[in-house]
């Protein structure tokens, strides 16, 4: 199961005593700041969590898997995420669900 923005808002409501509306606004504001920074070409560094980076990918040759036809894959900018060491360690040491 995936963690959703609604669940994050609910956790803030329960743990910090924020109103549901304020909790939802806080989550939305956080993600809007991350989006804005990336749109402006900035790296997003979240200490203890990881980094969101932008990478420019060049045009490259590709192939349509249905027809086998050669097609160019256009140049584009992509977002990458690199987890920080603390996050990696916590994930590696966590027990899988169901155990």
UniProtKB/Swiss-Prot annotation:
GO MF annotation, one: structural constituent of chromatin
UniProt feature coiled coil, ranges: none
One Gene Ontology CC term in the entry: cytosol
Keyword tags: DNA recombination, DNA-binding, Transcription, Transcription regulation, Translation regulation
Region Disordered, annotated ranges: 49-73
Any Pfam family hit: Bac_DNA_binding
Domain of life: Bacteria
Its job: This protein is one of the two subunits of integration host factor, a specific DNA-binding protein that functions in genetic recombination as well as in transcriptional and translational control.
PANTHER family reported in the protein's UniProt record: DNA-BINDING PROTEIN HU, INTEGRATION HOST FACTOR SUBUNIT ALPHA
Protein family according to the UniProt entry: Belongs to the bacterial histone-like protein family.
Protein name: Integration host factor subunit alpha
Lineage: Bacteria, Pseudomonadati, Pseudomonadota, Gammaproteobacteria, Enterobacterales
